[in-house]
């Protein structure tokens, strides 16, 4: 059974990654424009903006405007996470779970729980998979059911797909996941000429983001806002919800499916841990 579950986790992660990597991945970049964005975010972090810290971590992680540096990426994800930045909590948590010099399973799980409790669905999905694996921590199917159900109810596309896979596979259909399977069973079939909610979200997710537009908007807004790290409440930009901003997504708005950067490396990290 364990081998079957591990295989399903790996396949589900890789299938989810496939259509999204090229569309959403922040590619390495050494142009003058990319370096200018990197410099701008470096300045904003010194002023104390947690959103800038999270974005700077992403730039280091991808090698955008600078040399790729996972240690510095981890540093900035952790620093932003300290101030309650949900996306950074997720990313730092995932990096804590990977086999590396800074692996710390307890800290990784704790960060994912903090982020998930703030209704950040990728963290809830990750927790559900981790509790199912019986690898990083002992298997807990009650926790699996709770976290996967939470992610499903937050309209996380990958949680919905994974739940359906678990429900339809003969090897996992009898797992004691009553709340999750009840949600899957309650899904109504759609007309042949209409799109399901999953298909509609897939269309949203595969659209390539305009990173320059995101960066320009966030930099302009942060330059006009007060630093937020003194009170640790995430974005303090007046008149905007945290989830309106690319580097500060908390999934507070139903239309905001998830941070565009989460679909590839986070799932890859989890997939590597179930082999």
Predicted regions and their residues:
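Bacterial N-terminal signal peptides that target proteins for export
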Residues: 1-9
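Bacterial N-terminal signal peptides
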Residues: 9-19
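N-terminal leader/linker segments that initiate helical-solenoid repeat arrays
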Residues: 17-47, 51, 206, 214, ...
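Alpha-helical adaptor scaffolds
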Residues: 26-27, 58, 62, 71-118
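Structural signature of tandem alpha-helical TPR/SEL1-like repeats
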Residues: 30-38, 67-76, 101-111, 138-147
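Short helix-capping/linker turns of helical repeat alpha-solenoids
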Residues: 33, 41, 46-50, 62-64, ...
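Hydrophobic face of amphipathic alpha-helices that form TPR/SEL1-like repeat modules
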Residues: 55-62, 89-98, 126-133, 162-169
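TPR/TPR-like (Sel1-like) alpha-helical repeat modules
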Residues: 115, 138-158, 164-189
């Amino acid at each position: 059974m364990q081998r079957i579950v591990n295989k399903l986790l790996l396949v589900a992660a890789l299938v989810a990654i496939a259509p999204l990597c090229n569309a959403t991945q922040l590619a390495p970049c050494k142009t003058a424009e990319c370096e200018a964005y990197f410099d701008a975010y470096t300045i904003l972090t010194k002023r104390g903006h947690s959103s800038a810290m999270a974005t700077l971590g992403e730039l280091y992680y991808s090698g955008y405007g600078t040399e790729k540096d996972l240690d510095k990426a981890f540093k900035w994800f952790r620093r932003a996470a300290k101030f309650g930045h949900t996306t950074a909590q997720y990313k730092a948590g995932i990096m804590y779970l990977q086999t590396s010099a800074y692996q710390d399973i307890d800290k990784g799980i704790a960060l994912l729980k903090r982020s998930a409790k703030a209704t950040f669905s990728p963290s809830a999905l990750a927790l559900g998979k981790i509790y199912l694996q019986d690898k990083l921590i002992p298997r807990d199917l009650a926790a699996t059911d709770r976290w996967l159900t939470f992610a499903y109810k937050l309209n996380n596309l990958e949680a919905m797909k994974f739940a359906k896979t678990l429900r339809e596979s003969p090897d996992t259909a009898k797992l004691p996941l009553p709340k999750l399977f009840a949600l899957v069973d309650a899904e109504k079939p759609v007309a042949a000429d209409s799109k399901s909610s999953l298909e509609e979200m897939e269309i949203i997710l595969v659209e390539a983001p305009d990173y320059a537009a995101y960066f320009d908007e966030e930099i302009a807004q942060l330059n006009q806002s007060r630093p937020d790290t003194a009170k640790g409440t995430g974005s303090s930009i007046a008149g905007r919800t945290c989830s309106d901003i690319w580097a500060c997504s908390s999934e507070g708005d139903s239309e905001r499916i998830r941070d565009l950067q989460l679909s590839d490396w986070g799932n890859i990290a989890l997939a590597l841990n179930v082999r």
